[in-house]
Amino acid sequence: MTKHIFVTGGVVSSLGKGITAASLGRLLKSRGYRVTMQKADPYLNVDPGTMSPFQHGEVFVTEDGYESDLDLGHYERFIDENLTRDSNFTTGAIYQDLIARERHGDFLGGTVQVIPHVTNAIKAKFRGVEEQTDADVVITELGGTIGDIEGQPFVEAIRQYKKDAGAENVCYIHVSLVPYIAAAHEVKTKPTQHSVKELRSFGIQPDIIVLRSDHHIEDDVRAKIASFTDVDVDCVFTCEDAPSIYDVPRMMAEQDFDLRVCERLGLDPRERDMADWEGFLAAKDHAENEGDPVKIALVGKYTQLPDAYLSVIEALHHAGTHLGKHVEVELVDGEALSDDNVEQVLGDASGILVPGGFGKRAFDGKITAARYAREHQVPYLGICLGMQVAVCEFARDVLGYADASSSEFDPQCAHAVIDLLDEQEGVTEKGGTMRLGAYPCALVAGTLAAEAYGEALVQERHRHRYEFNSAYREELETAGLVVSGTSPDGELVEMVELRRDLHPWFVATQAHPEFKSRPTRPHPLFREFVRAAAE
């Protein structure tokens, strides 16, 4: 029987529920269990795909093309499994489906209500991911905070699920803040007491509590919380701020967090094998403390919020760890970058990366960054829009097409070297309609891309509407812009790079390789980019 673990949060949001859940997933997998993960988001958006990165951070894309919450990126990186669209759902998606079914007549004229219809639909999502993956353990994180009005149907659903699946197959973990009051020189337990009281008012008694704090929590504080919440003291854990999110599994393992979960669910506490994770942590510590610094300038549009580029930043650090280099990522506001200040801003960068994005704002600054990288022989990695930027800059400054651009930004430009995909013609809906998910890419032998991957055919995830305009392909290639990867039929250009006699390492891809990088297995493009930047 599949075991279900539900992770809720209390007091405030952004506590680290996702990291706690992902760490548990890693620990259970290290004990030999098949683990999958899921995020339930109570907001009314159907998915995060159209949400502003300033509000929600990056949109993570799964292999099967779902635009998901960034926590799925944490899940994939920690448990090293590819998740699917079944691993993330929202209130908006639940209601959209229910209303469509009601309009279709599926409820035979019955009154459609939150209980049982909404809660049943939510529980069907729990069962669905279990059936799809055949996992031993499903870990579901409930977004938001206990007490939020929009989250109440989800809380009711996880309460009911204990009866549906059997009490022995369900575990409730509550992550709560224990704030430190500087004036009093002590941590306060009252917020957690009230949070658990709120949770219990919905009929859920937590089995395990995880206390989040930026200060050390003494055993007497744990005992106090255990007493007030009716939770065994050995099931009250502390998760203090760590040097890195990747240190959290080790911190929790030292407290036997996963052992208590196994005991609660009747799972055989198999021996834990964390050798690969410990090896990664040792390499990371060595790279950060003793490795040569490698400064990467990430030129973007949403640089005020690093989470907007979370997977890119993590992929750079994975590569640095693998190579024994201390990667320093500097976020550069593309909107503020110009010919007048580019030397001052990018002059000390070992490498320049232009990530994905949408809209014209900051486009000119990204063009400036690509030009600087090309002219000054600075290693360059372009991702999605970053590839389009590289193509536009080359067409402008090498071919001499001063107005070369993307039809996304200038529909009337004479030289649209980046144009709308044929399949996007006539598409008016914004949500979930782009070219999404994994597509094959055939690499050209002898190119930097082919050497990085070491394979002739690779799969990468995509999220875009616009593509390289092949009408300019011959002209661009003649001038030195090599097409190094295409769709298997050769129709779509997926990767480009500068000829080696023009630049030592200048590679750009229409895909989002950052989504497939793992702590113990860095993505080859990021690995070779950092290697080139370190030389």
Spans of model-derived segments:
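Short acidic-aromatic active-site loops that bind/stabilize oxyanions
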Residues: 108-119, 302, 356-363, 434, ...
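Flexible phosphate-sensing "switch/lid" loops adjacent to ATP/NTP-binding sites
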Residues: 1-328, 335-351, 358-359, 366-372, ...
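Short low-complexity, flexible loop/linker segments enriched in glycine and/or proline
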Residues: 50-53, 224, 395-398, 499-501
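Cysteine-nucleophile active-site neighborhood
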Residues: 18, 22-26, 30, 345-440, ...
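A generic structural signal for well-ordered coil/turn residues at beta-strand boundaries
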Residues: 1, 205, 232, 292, ...
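Active-site proximal loops enriched in glycine and acidic residues that flank catalytic Cys/His/Asp
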Residues: 9, 39, 213, 240, ...
